[in-house]
UniProtKB/Swiss-Prot annotation:
<dbReference type="InterPro" id="IPR013317">
    <property type="entry name" value="DnaA_dom"/>
</dbReference>
<dbReference type="GO" id="GO:0005886">
    <property type="term" value="C:plasma membrane"/>
</dbReference>
<dbReference type="InterPro" id="IPR001957">
    <property type="entry name" value="Chromosome_initiator_DnaA"/>
</dbReference>
<comment type="function">
    <text>Plays an essential role in the initiation and regulation of chromosomal replication. ATP-DnaA binds to the origin of replication (oriC) to initiate formation of the DNA replication initiation complex once per cell cycle. Binds the DnaA box (a 9 base pair repeat at the origin) and separates the double-stranded (ds)DNA. Forms a right-handed helical filament on oriC DNA; dsDNA binds to the exterior of the filament while single-stranded (ss)DNA is stabiized in the filament's interior.</text>
</comment>
<feature type="region of interest" description="Domain II">
    <location>
        <begin position="83"/>
        <end position="126"/>
    </location>
</feature>
<dbReference type="GO" id="GO:0005737">
    <property type="term" value="C:cytoplasm"/>
</dbReference>
<comment type="subunit">
    <text>Oligomerizes as a right-handed, spiral filament on DNA at oriC.</text>
</comment>
<dbReference type="GO" id="GO:0006275">
    <property type="term" value="P:regulation of DNA replication"/>
</dbReference>
<keyword id="KW-0067">ATP-binding</keyword>
<dbReference type="GO" id="GO:0003688">
    <property type="term" value="F:DNA replication origin binding"/>
</dbReference>
<dbReference type="InterPro" id="IPR018312">
    <property type="entry name" value="Chromosome_initiator_DnaA_CS"/>
</dbReference>
<dbReference type="InterPro" id="IPR024633">
    <property type="entry name" value="DnaA_N_dom"/>
</dbReference>
<dbReference type="InterPro" id="IPR003593">
    <property type="entry name" value="AAA+_ATPase"/>
</dbReference>
<feature type="region of interest" description="Domain III, AAA+ region">
    <location>
        <begin position="127"/>
        <end position="343"/>
    </location>
</feature>
<feature type="binding site">
    <location>
        <position position="173"/>
    </location>
    <ligand>
        <name>ATP</name>
    </ligand>
</feature>
<dbReference type="GO" id="GO:0008289">
    <property type="term" value="F:lipid binding"/>
</dbReference>
<keyword id="KW-0235">DNA replication</keyword>
Length: 463
């Protein structure tokens, strides 16, 4: 046996696992085969535990397939072996391209803050909000991968996930995670030069530097940070001079093993007005979506927010609010703040009837905006078919998949029962609706396109 055994396993895992999972959990592993033992090295304990819990059966199964009774014993360790990691093909992930070999190799260098520099020290404005941490970020299925990736970056900046690109709609927690990473890095290394900013601040700083003939100082400032966290990168669109400068800053940071984290409201390749060479680099590390929170996560967010305010929020009230406000975390928190303020002003107990009254206009607006009829029209327009097709008996994939998507959205965004949804789709049985919902949930895990379609439609219907 040789190390090619692990390369064979990688190839199979690449085919079997969703691209994001492969990039996040499998690609960072290093392998060493000796004495009939295959040692897999994980960059930290978090990755080790996750891989061992989630993928050990997959890996052992492949070892048995390739080697039969001679399959090596699998061992996991934290750390890295003193050789170049096993290379995987650029096809490893459709959403996270493999950076050039020189950049990958640089990820094994010492952290930038451990290197001695001859340059005089600069004054850094961190702008990281200490209130946003991993501890008060409510994790759910919609943001689990994003939080896990951010946690790993905080523990190992400049490592496997560089750059980390988080994308999703407004108010879903992207900014919270940026600050959480910054706080995590500075907790580990208090002297780390971590800079958080909105992309427009980068543009403003560059303009001021040009006006003051201080562009070299601008370059040195941004290229000497240990971690650069930029929010809403889509605002670079059509700003050619800013893109040019950020392109060179990006390259300098990556070559220096300094961490970059970017956020956007859309997938990198869908950002209009940004140069292709930049969009390509955005995908060199790991790209992860944050989706609108599912019902259970929305309830958990409300309960945690109430607890932080020393407010007792009955579970049925949290469920009532979460079932009706679905678009994003910011909307949920705003609604809860209004409920709490009304309760404080009036001295009344927080009940469902009280919430109905306090959020009367907001709930009425939601019910008006999201109806099954509206969902059907939006989905039909999105997939360029007719509403009549969604209600028909046609079973071709070009019609069946949009119909399943519309049913899943109706269950997610309205308060209608499964039988009511079935009736609205040509008199279908409730079991058909249930199957459609489960199918879309499965496809969202397996297909980047379906995940994007679902997120785009949620965003359209909730706006």
């Amino acid at each position: 046996m040789s190390l090619s055994l692990w390369q064979q396993c990688l190839a199979r895992l690449q085919d079997e696992l969703p691209a994001t999972e492969f990039s996040m959990w499998i690609r960072p592993l290093q392998a060493e085969l000796s004495d009939n033992t295959l040692a897999l090295y994980a960059p930290n304990r978090f990755v080790l535990d996750w891989v061992r819990d989630k993928y050990i059966n997959n890996i052992n199964g492949l070892l048995n397939d390739f080697c039969g009774s001679d399959a090596p014993v699998l061992r996991f360790e934290v750390g890295s072996k003193p050789i170049v990691p096993v290379a995987v093909s650029s096809a490893a992930s459709s959403g996270a391209s493999v950076p050039p070999a020189a950049v990958r190799a640089s990820s094994l260098a010492r952290p930038s803050w451990e290197r001695v520099t001859a340059q005089p020290e600069l004054s850094y404005r961190s702008n990281v909000n200490p209130k946003h941490t991993f501890d008060n970020f409510v994790e759910g299925k919609s943001n689990q991968l994003a939080r896990a990736a951010a946690r790993q970056v905080a523990d190992n900046p400049g490592g496997a996930y560089n750059p980390l690109f988080l994308y999703g709609g407004t108010g879903l927690g992207k900014t919270h995670l940026l600050h959480a990473v910054g706080n995590g890095i500075m907790a580990r290394k208090p002297n780390a030069k971590v800079v958080y900013m909105h992309s427009e601040r980068f543009v403003q700083d560059m303009v001021k530097a040009l006006q003051n003939n201080a562009i070299e100082e601008f370059k040195r400032y941004y290229r000497s940070v240990d971690a650069l966290l930029i929010d809403d990168i889509q605002f670079f669109a059509n700003k050619e001079r800013s893109q040019e400068e950020f392109f060179h800053t990006f390259n300098a940071l990556l070559e220096g093993n300094q961490q970059i984290i970017l956020t956007s409201d859309r997938y990198p390749k869908e950002i209009n007005g940004v140069e292709d060479r930049l969009k390509s680099r955005f995908g060199w590390g790991l790209t992860v979506a944050i989706e609108p929170p599912e019902l259970e996560t929305r309830v958990a967010i409300l309960m945690k927010k109430a607890d932080e305010n020393d407010i007792r929020l009955p579970g049925e009230v949290a469920f009532f609010i979460a079932k009706r406000l679905r678009s994003n975390v910011r909307e949920l928190e705003g609604a809860l703040n209004r409920v709490i303020a009304n309760a404080n002003f009036t001295g009344r107990a927080i009940t469902i009837d009280f919430v109905r009254e306090a959020l009367r206009d907001l709930l009425a607006l939601q019910e008006k905006l999201v109806t099954i009829d509206n969902i059907q029209k939006t989905v039909a327009e999105y997939y360029k078919i007719k509403v009549a097709d969604l209600l028909s008996k046609r079973r071709s994939r070009s019609v069946a998949r949009p119909r399943q998507m519309a049913m899943a959205l109706a269950k997610e965004l309205t308060n209608h029962s499964l039988p009511e949804i079935g009736d609205a789709f040509g008199g279908r049985d409730h079991t058909t609706v249930l199957h459609a919902c489960r199918k879309i949930e499965q496809l969202r895990e397996e297909s980047h396109d379906i995940k994007e379609d679902f997120s785009n439609l949620i965003r359209t219907l909730s706006s």
